[in-house]
Regions:
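Nucleic-acid endonuclease domains
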Residues: 1-172
Length: 172
């Protein structure tokens, strides 16, 4: 008699690959995947778990690429925006939309990413941009993420087309 996981239909080759519960086999693979998805839902409650898994896969590939080549994949902006979407619930605009990257509630949000390659922990944004919040995402060389959400009003006033935000200047 063939043992199959009742949840996935996959064949279990050995009794150690699953548990017998209420007259059915359930594979450890299914149980572990379920627990992983529950953990993701706790960490990113407003996000689609599949999108979060894609984000984690991208991080794994980027880290593996760095380990193999000594170089970083140049996907920082997309990683920052994706993190903003899954962690904060930013609803992103279509690609190449002018003015801001997305919305958080009623606020237009500009997302800027500080990569581990950047020489200084600062970003600049166009003063002409249509945003009321600036979300700065900082990524370490170990692919760990931290973020700060800043009101546009708190950016320093001044001449020029760009406003600057320095990570060390604030603990917000």
């Amino acid at each position: 008699m063939t043992m199959r996981c009742s949840m996935t239909g996959k064949v279990l080759h050995d009794t150690s690959e699953g548990i017998w519960d209420d007259g059915e086999w359930i594979s450890w693979e299914y149980i572990n995947q379920y627990l992983y998805e529950q953990e993701l839902k706790r960490e990113f409650p407003e996000s689609d778990p599949q999108l979060v898994m894609v984000f984690h896969d991208l991080l794994d590939v980027a880290a593996e690429y760095k380990n193999l080549t000594g170089r970083y994949l140049q996907i920082w902006g997309e990683l920052g925006e994706l993190y903003a979407e899954i962690k904060f619930g930013v609803k992103r605009h279509r690609p190449c939309a002018q003015g801001s990257d997305g919305k958080l509630g009623d606020d237009f949000v500009e997302v800027k990413t500080i990569s581990p390659e950047k020489g200084a922990d600062r970003v600049q944004v166009k003063r002409a941009g249509n945003f009321s919040k600036l979300l700065v995402i900082k990524i370490t060389d170990n692919f760990e993420f931290t973020a700060r959400l800043i009101d546009r009003k708190s950016l320093k006033k001044g001449p020029g087309k760009h406003a600057k935000y320095v990570w060390q200047d604030s603990t917000t």
